[in-house]
Curated annotation (Swiss-Prot):
Keywords: Cytoplasm, Hydrolase, RNA-binding, tRNA-binding. It comes from Clostridium kluyveri (strain ATCC 8527 / DSM 555 / NBRC 12016 / NCIMB 10680 / K1). Pfam families: Pept_tRNA_hydro. The record marks 91 as: Stabilizes the basic form of H active site to accept a proton. Hydrolyzes ribosome-free peptidyl-tRNAs (with 1 or more amino acids incorporated), which drop off the ribosome during protein synthesis, or as a result of ribosome stalling. Catalyzes the release of premature peptidyl moieties from peptidyl-tRNA molecules trapped in stalled 50S ribosomal subunits, and thus maintains levels of free tRNAs and 50S ribosomes. The keyword Repeat does not apply. Its EC number is 3.1.1.29. This is Peptidyl-tRNA hydrolase. Transmembrane segments: none annotated. It catalyses: an N-acyl-L-alpha-aminoacyl-tRNA + H2O = an N-acyl-L-amino acid + a tRNA + H(+). GO terms for cellular component: cytoplasm.
């Protein structure tokens, strides 16, 4: 069983913003594999289903970004998920739009949602897919809570589709294979 967590903020005003790319990812996986997030628990919305032969739980924390670790910890404890069976998807300002990176461990890199997950789990060793949203030329908060331009949104949709393939690869073949295959990806 895998726990797949997309990070974002709840509420209509955050829908499809740069900081909600993790929610966009979960929406795409949910649609592709017909997994409905119609249950409320773990301080968030979740659904269970299958991606190929892999049983998965898709989770969107409902705690706002900075407290995402509370939701993740509750789901991890309930399902007794091992760290290598939990995959977190989130935005990264240090990666250009049109790219993403897969990592199996690492610091929060200034991302408050990841910082809170590390705090709540007591480890930074867990797989993650970091989707590039580009570096701002303006105030960071305004940038991450802003929406993509029309052209950038088109590119983000392509990146999301490829990052779903990366998720499938992680589950089927392991994170090292996925990192070797996808970390050079660029539109």
């Amino acid at each position: 069983m895998f726990l797949i967590v997309g990070l974002g903020n709840i509420g209509v005003k955050y829908h499809r913003t740069r900081h909600n790319i993790g929610f966009d990812f979960i929406d795409l996986v949910s649609k592709k594999y017909n997994i409905t997030l119609n249950r409320e628990k773990f301080k968030g919305n979740y659904g269970e289903g299958f991606i190929g032969q892999n049983k998965v739980i898709l989770l969107k924390p409902g705690t706002y970004m900075n407290l995402s670790g509370e939701s993740v910890r509750e789901a991890v404890n309930f399902y007794k998920i091992e760290n290598d069976r939990m995959i977190i998807i989130y935005d990264d300002i240090d990666i250009d739009i049109g790219r993403f990176r897969i990592r199996h461990r690492g610091s929060a890199g200034g991302h408050n949602g990841i910082k809170n997950i590390i705090l709540n789990l007591g480890t930074d060793v867990f797989p993650r897919i970091k989707i590039g949203i580009g570096h701002p030329n303006v105030d960071l908060v305004s940038y991450v809570l802003g929406k993509f331009s029309e052209d950038d949104r088109i590119n983000i949709e392509k990146v999301l589709k490829t990052s779903v393939e990366a998720l499938e690869c992680i589950m089927d073949f392991g994170i090292e294979v996925a990192m070797n295959k996808f970390n050079g990806f660029k539109l």
